[in-house]
């Protein structure tokens, strides 16, 4: 996936198109992400014991990863990302793979 937990993204399709948010949780098995404060749905929940009453609960639903675009931390624009290998190596001795912004060519990963 081109986004990770903690990235700031722009929603490019759907009912929240044009809104920004931070990724709360990534679900790579189903190619979806949960974005803070976006894609709010109402869930009718049954009571679950004495401490958890039932009712209509608002929660954030997952959005498909193709409907979000990463906002580059260096240039501040929503842009496509790519991956490249650096000269330095990771802990296993392999070249380190990082994401970069295709608009400004800055490395996104630390």
Curated annotation (Swiss-Prot):
Report the domain of life of the source organism: Bacteria
Q: Name one GO biological process term.
A: translation
* Database matches in SUPFAM superfamilies: Translation proteins SH3-like domain
Enumerate the CDD domains for this protein. KOW_RPL26 (cd06089)
Which keywords appear in this protein's UniProt record, sorted alphabetically? Ribonucleoprotein, Ribosomal protein, RNA-binding, rRNA-binding
Signal peptide position in this chain?
none
Q: Which GO terms describe its cellular component?
A: ribonucleoprotein complex; ribosome
Please list the GO terms describing molecular function: rRNA binding; structural constituent of ribosome
Subunit relationships: Part of the 50S ribosomal subunit.
Report the family membership. Answer: Belongs to the universal ribosomal protein uL24 family.
PANTHER family, alphabetically?
A: MITOCHONDRIAL RIBOSOMAL PROTEIN L24
Q: What does this protein do?
A: One of two assembly initiator proteins, it binds directly to the 5'-end of the 23S rRNA, where it nucleates assembly of the 50S subunit.
Task: Give the protein name, as stated in the record.
Answer: Large ribosomal subunit protein uL24
Task: Name the gene that codes for it.
Answer: rplX
């Amino acid at each position: 996936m081109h986004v990770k937990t903690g990235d700031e993204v722009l929603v490019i399709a759907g009912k929240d198109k044009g809104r920004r948010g931070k990724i709360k949780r990534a679900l790579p098995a189903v190619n979806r992400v949960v974005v803070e404060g976006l894609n709010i749905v109402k869930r009718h929940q049954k009571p679950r014991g004495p401490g958890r009453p039932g009712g209509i609960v608002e929660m954030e639903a997952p959005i498909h990863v193709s409907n979000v675009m990463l906002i580059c931390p260096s240039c501040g624009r929503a842009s496509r990302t790519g991956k490249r290998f650096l000269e330095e190596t990771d802990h296993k001795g392999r070249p380190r793979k990082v994401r970069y912004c295709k608009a400004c060519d800055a490395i996104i990963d630390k």
